[in-house]
């Protein structure tokens, strides 16, 4: 088995090899740009790792891994347009660096390019990959729409929020793993279980992201409090509203509906309310619940223990990160 960094390095080299300069430059340059401004390469790594774990040369999974990464970045380009976000990974967003129309067109092209990379596989594997990819792409769009809808909703339940992050984030983690299993042509049971593992892990991953946005370690360079400043209805916020006193609830609603005199003061006070209502404790418990659920599914996979342990270590490293 390869080290995770080995998969990542091989993937980046493969991606660079296949990102050819093409015309019109104002369509393709933004694609190259967004794919080269960093990112953890989590999803393509999982596709390669899954193929390896199920007994196939992981190099066979590189085209699917590239499709997954391009699709993920397509979703970010369009998310940034909808959020009017000026920065992504510390760099100007595509629509900011170019323009809105170019951002839309480049994103659309990325979605189509992702499908084209599946054409490298034989027909039966291509059909399976395209099926899970289409299902996942629709779910990601549904998740994004839920997120947009929640901005206008006065009330959002915990279950609604969990469904939104499952669709917007976790289904692609599950699909990335399942694609590796499809390429390895493992059993149908293994394909479903590795997807379910990824779905649970993806939910835990996003919940951990929500937690770190407020309670992460600023010394690592991560900007703390971005979700608070954007008035995002994360699980921290929703649970604080649910568990807080009438006074705490009203203060939180006011903080999220008025322009702050000081951004730092807003972050500090909202964080204090999260702690006072113990919503941060609830969120940490949810991260642990979904991580343990993922590992319980992993235990039922029909693969050797040492391969299960690789996935457990990788999952554990995601949940224990500080940035």
List the model feature ranges, each with a label:
Residues 1-323:
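All-alpha prenyltransferase/terpene-synthase fold signal
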């Amino acid at each position: 088995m390869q080290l995770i960094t080995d998969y990542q390095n091989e993937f980046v080299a493969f991606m660079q090899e296949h990102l050819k300069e093409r015309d019109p430059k104002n369509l393709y340059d933004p694609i190259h740009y967004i794919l080269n401004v960093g990112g953890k390469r989590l999803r393509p790594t999982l596709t390669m790792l899954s193929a390896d774990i199920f007994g196939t040369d992981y190099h066979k999974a590189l085209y699917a891994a590239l499709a997954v990464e391009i699709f993920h970045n397509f979703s970010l380009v369009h998310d940034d347009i909808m959020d009017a976000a000026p920065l992504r990974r510390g760099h100007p967003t595509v629509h900011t660096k170019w323009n809105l129309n170019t951002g839309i067109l480049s994103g659309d092209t990325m979605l189509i390019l992702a499908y084209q990379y599946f054409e490298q596989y034989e027909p039966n594997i291509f059909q399976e990959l395209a099926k899970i990819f289409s299902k996942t792409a629709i779910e990601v769009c549904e998740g994004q729409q839920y997120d947009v809808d929640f901005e206008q909703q006065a009330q959002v339940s915990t279950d609604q929020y969990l469904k939104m992050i499952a669709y917007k984030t976790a289904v692609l983690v599950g699909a990335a793993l399942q694609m590796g299993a499809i390429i390895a042509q493992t059993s149908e049971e293994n394909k479903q279980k590795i997807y379910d593992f990824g779905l649970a892990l993806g939910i835990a991953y996003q919940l951990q992201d929500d937690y770190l946005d407020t309670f992460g370690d600023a010394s690592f360079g991560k900007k703390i409090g971005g979700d608070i400043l954007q008035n995002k209805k994360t699980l921290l916020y929703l649970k604080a509203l649910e568990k807080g006193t009438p006074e705490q609830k009203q203060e939180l609603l006011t903080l999220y509906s008025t322009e702050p005199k000081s951004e730092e003061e807003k972050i500090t006070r909202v964080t204090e309310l999260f702690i006072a209502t113990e919503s941060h404790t609830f969120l940490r418990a949810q991260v642990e619940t979904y991580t343990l659920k993922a590992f319980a599914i992993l235990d039922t996979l029909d693969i050797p223990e040492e391969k299960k342990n690789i996935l457990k270590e990788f999952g554990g490293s995601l949940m224990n990160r500080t940035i």
